[in-house]
Amino acid sequence: QGIAWKSGWRIFGRPILQKHRGSHIEAGPGLVLRSWPRSNPLSPTHPVVLSTRNADAELTIGADCGFTGAVVVAGERVSIGNRVQVGGNAQIVDTDFHPLTPEGRAADFNAGATRPITIEDDVFIGMNALILKGVTLGESCVVGAGSVVSRDVPPRTIVAGNPAQVVRELREGE
């Protein structure tokens, strides 16, 4: 019914955990949630938020991941691998939250489109980045600060910008 709690979690400040009845939130050991400005020099502007929006939603986080004032919302499924670091105030959302048309919003304001997000192992997401629905972030990729990611990112690449574009591939040993 609740959130699967694992060993070694470190929580700074008060994160917001919003779990819809029937949904699933699980995080591996070694999770770090930084919701307190004094815990990180980049000072999060709000607490970490981990949220599921409906009964079928799944949010899974692997081992040894860290979040600073980040927001992760699963309307369908957000899967985050191991050793993923999410920078200050970044947002990961697999939903539009509401329909895009006025008619759709009038019919059901909360019926926004969803597509799963997959974040593979060893990914780094820079501060203020936005990861949108349907995206896969490949293993060991880096998302630059302030980037808006609406398309898949290949493994071992650096992307930046709005929309995010490949800047370069990571060299061996980087």
Task: Show where each model-derived region lies.
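Histidine-centered beta-alpha loop that forms part of the nucleotide-sugar donor binding/catalytic region
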Residues: F97
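Active-site-proximal flexible loops/turns
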Residues: T101, R105, N128, R168
